[in-house]
Design a protein with these regions (language model features):
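Functionally critical mobile loop/hinge segments
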Residues: 9, 21-116
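Alpha-helical transmembrane segments of multipass membrane proteins
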Residues: 15-16
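Aromatic-lined, polymer-binding surfaces characteristic
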Residues: 1-9
């Protein structure tokens, strides 16, 4: 599965952008920056490593908000990002819902077959 902490940090980036004086367009750009940057980070069920992923999410939220406020954002020419922010979000959820099933199985297999 996609790391829930990282996905939740997209909302943090929106709030940070708003607090920096951003408007709707800035918030949309921040969301696109987040999706482009952190999509694919998996949940491995290892709670101590969650703090590392939270740190990645928070620092990327700040970076994405700052870039957005400077007028910089990932465009539809790159990766899974679409011109429409809602479509970009749907692309992210499709990856989480459909593409991560095999990843979940592999992570579980690795965790249950360790020799520690």
């Amino acid at each position: 599965a996609l790391c829930g902490c990282v996905v939740a940090s997209i909302g943090s980036s929106c709030g940070i952008t708003y607090l920096m004086g951003g408007d709707y367009v800035n918030v949309c750009h921040s969301v696109k920056n987040m999706i482009a940057n952190l999509t694919g980070m998996i949940c491995d069920g290892a709670k101590p490593s969650c703090s590392l992923k939270i740190s990645s999410g928070v620092s990327t939220a700040i970076l994405s908000a700052t870039l957005s406020m400077e007028g910089k954002h990932v465009t539809a020419a790159e990766g899974i990002i679409d011109e429409d922010v809602d479509k970009s979000i749907r692309n992210l959820t499709s990856i989480g819902k459909e593409a991560m099933c095999n990843t979940d199985d592999m992570v579980l297999n690795i965790m249950t077959h360790k020799c520690n």
